[in-house]
Swiss-Prot record:
The lineage of its organism: Bacteria, Pseudomonadati, Pseudomonadota, Gammaproteobacteria, Enterobacterales. One of its GO terms (cellular component) is plasma membrane. Coiled coil: none annotated. The chain crosses the membrane at residues 9-29. Belongs to the CcmE/CycJ family. Its main location: membrane. It is a single-pass type II membrane protein. Residues 1-8 are cytoplasmic. InterPro entries: CcmE, CcmE-like_sf, NA-bd_OB-fold. GO terms for biological process: cytochrome complex assembly. Heme chaperone required for the biogenesis of c-type cytochromes. Transiently binds heme delivered by CcmC and transfers the heme to apo-cytochromes in a process facilitated by CcmF and CcmH. This is Cytochrome c-type biogenesis protein CcmE 1. GO terms for molecular function: heme binding; metal ion binding.
C-alpha cells in the first residue's frame, strides 16, 4: 500500500470514529431528557408489557383524573397537593406554581415531574386536558356576537 492510500485510510477511519462517538454522545444526552408516560396504575403495578416499575427519582409524565376532594392548597404560597387516579389506583402530586385555568377536581391532567418515595410525584409542570367540545369563553362570546341576528328595522313604505 502506498503512502497516499494509507493516509486516506487513516482519515476515513478517524472520520468514522468521530461520527460514532458523536452519535453515542447524542443518544446518551437524549436518553437523559426522555420523560416516559405513565398512568397512576402503571406507577403502582408497572407497565403492562414488562411489569417494570418506574425508579424513584425518575423523570416522568403522569396522566390521570384529579380525585374529587383531594386538592389541598397552601394559603400562604402557590403550593398545591392533589391525587391523580385511574381505574387501577392513585398517586399523590405536589406542585408549586400557577395551575392552568382548566384545572379542577374530576378533570383530566398530565403532570411532568420526578417520582419520589411512596408513589408521590413532585411536579414541575401541570397540563390540564379539555374535551374536544371545549370552546374558550372569549371565542364563544365572539361567536355569539358575530352570529347575532341583525335587529329588524321596519320602514314605512306606504308614503
Amino acid at each position: 500500500m502506498n503512502l497516499r492510500r494509507k493516509n486516506r485510510l487513516w482519515v476515513v477511519c478517524a472520520v468514522l470514529a468521530g461520527l460514532a462517538l458523536t452519535t453515542a454522545l447524542v443518544l446518551y444526552a437524549l436518553r437523559a431528557n426522555i420523560d416516559l408516560f405513565y398512568t397512576p396504575g402503571e406507577i403502582l403495578y408497572g407497565k403492562r408489557e414488562t411489569q417494570q416499575l418506574p425508579a424513584v427519582g425518575q423523570r416522568l409524565r403522569v396522566g390521570g383524573m384529579v380525585m374529587p376532594g383531594s386538592v389541598r392548597r397552601d394559603p400562604d404560597s402557590l403550593k398545591v397537593n392533589f391525587s391523580l387516579y385511574d381505574a387501577e389506583g392513585s398517586v399523590t402530586v405536589s406542585y408549586e406554581g400557577i395551575l392552568p385555568d382548566l384545572f379542577r377536581e374530576g378533570q383530566g391532567v398530565v403532570v411532568q415531574g420526578t417520582l419520589e418515595k411512596g408513589n408521590h410525584v413532585l411536579a414541575h409542570e401541570v397540563l390540564a386536558k379539555h374535551d374536544e367540545n371545549y370552546t374558550p369563553p372569549e371565542v364563544e362570546k365572539a361567536m355569539q356576537e358575530n352570529h347575532r341576528r341583525p335587529q329588524r328595522v321596519d320602514k314605512d313604505t306606504s308614503s
